[in-house]
Amino acid sequence: IGTGIGVGVLLGGKPHVGNFHLEIGHMLIPNSDKFKGVCEIHGDCWEGLASGPSIESRWGSEASKLSKSHEAWEKEADLLAKGLINIISNHSPDKIIMGGGVMSQKQLFPMIRSNVERAWNKYTPLVSLSNLISEPGLGTDSGIIGSISLISN
């Protein structure tokens, strides 16, 4: 989660693709305020509401410059959780790894988990949310290492 919201799905250890690459960042999610979003195609899709550029547009500052206690983070956690609820409902994943520039704000993880738990409302049993929703084990190098891994396979 940074300049956009990209999602990869692995099934049986292999990337899942259909007729074209997944565009989960462009799913529509409920928005509780008047912010129109920044996506040039959909405006208020998940990426248009919760990506780095949307944070800057909504709050007038880059995410990295906002204090950890800024109200933006509660809104961001809510928006990210809404997208994750759709992913959980549709894919029943074993793991959701959230990385990128926006997710370098570590205070987001417990906030997102709390929002997911509240929104899921015990609909079905979920694994421990701290195990389900996690940060990349490879830190900021995960994107490049994953790309190299895909190319080499």
Predicted regions and their residues:
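Short beta-strand scaffold segments in enzyme catalytic cores
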Residues: 5-11
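Short secondary-structure boundary segments
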Residues: 1-3, 100-101
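A short acidic/small-residue loop/turn micro-motif
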Residues: 22-25
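ATP-binding/phosphotransfer module of carbohydrate and carboxylate kinases, centering on a glycine-rich
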Residues: 15, 31-153
